[in-house]
């Protein structure tokens, strides 16, 4: 499957997110609902984005005791989320119970992606962890695969190594910035073309699209770059 673009609807009002989503109809396949938008709008935003024709990635990065995360996965699946994130550092029991919870939805089970090392971390910045973020991401990816997760969230810099060592595991890469774009608060960034060449399956882009004069055109340009990189 060719790499797909996910637009992060990281906006402060539900109405703004829906206006942007309508502008992006037919231009992108996926939208991301993150903590800010979900806290503002609740599960109804997932249904409303489905009604506009989008696949929905719910990026809540679940991290709690196994039972709580399993129940949250069920709630997200019932709301229609098709891809969810949870922290690999929650451990085997948490991730395994999340897998069981997701699978209880049969053909409508959401994909589960484990968060490895946030792309805002640079070397030596992860609290209590001395490993380089890229090495730490690779270690957690191996665990995620053994725990039954569908993929991991990692920077494009880790994608090639993860793909080589964890056969069948998908990579979802935030921190994607077109050449010349502001890095904002991201550190381990990569261009769309390089991320695709590294093996990314999903590319998450927010501000370079949200802040563009024409978000739909910005999304089309990024997808053209992704397609040309194959």
Which role does the model predict for each range below?
Residues 95-101, 105, 196, 209-230:
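C-terminal helical cap(s) of enzyme catalytic domains, especially alpha/beta-barrels
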Residues 7, 31, 61, 84, ...:
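Conserved, mostly hydrophobic/aromatic
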Residues 2-3, 64, 68-151, 155-160, ...:
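Conserved anion-binding
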Residues 1-23, 27:
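N-terminal glycine-rich anion-binding loop in soluble enzyme alpha/beta folds
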